Amino acid sequence: MKRTYQPSKQKRNRTHGFRARMATKNGRQVLNRRRAKGRKRLTV
């Protein structure tokens, strides 16, 4: 059986990257929440 996690940097960035977050209103909300919480890394 094939494992579910098949790592790919390109897929990772396109789905969870900074530009992907900035592209939608909800993604920007995610970034703002993480900034407010004081996260060291905002994305990926």
Swiss-Prot record:
Name one process (GO BP) from the record: translation
Ribonucleoprotein is among the record's keywords? yes
Q: Which GO terms describe its molecular function?
A: structural constituent of ribosome
Q: Which GO terms describe its cellular component?
A: ribonucleoprotein complex; ribosome
Where is the sequence biased in composition, kind Basic residues? 1-19, 31-44
What domain of life? Bacteria
Keyword set for this entry? Ribonucleoprotein, Ribosomal protein
Disulfide bridges in this chain: none
Short name of one Pfam family: Ribosomal_L34
Q: Which family does it belong to?
A: Belongs to the bacterial ribosomal protein bL34 family.
Protein name as catalogued: Large ribosomal subunit protein bL34
- According to its UniProt entry, this protein's organism is Coxiella burnetii (strain RSA 493 / Nine Mile phase I)
Biological classification of the source: Bacteria, Pseudomonadati, Pseudomonadota, Gammaproteobacteria, Legionellales
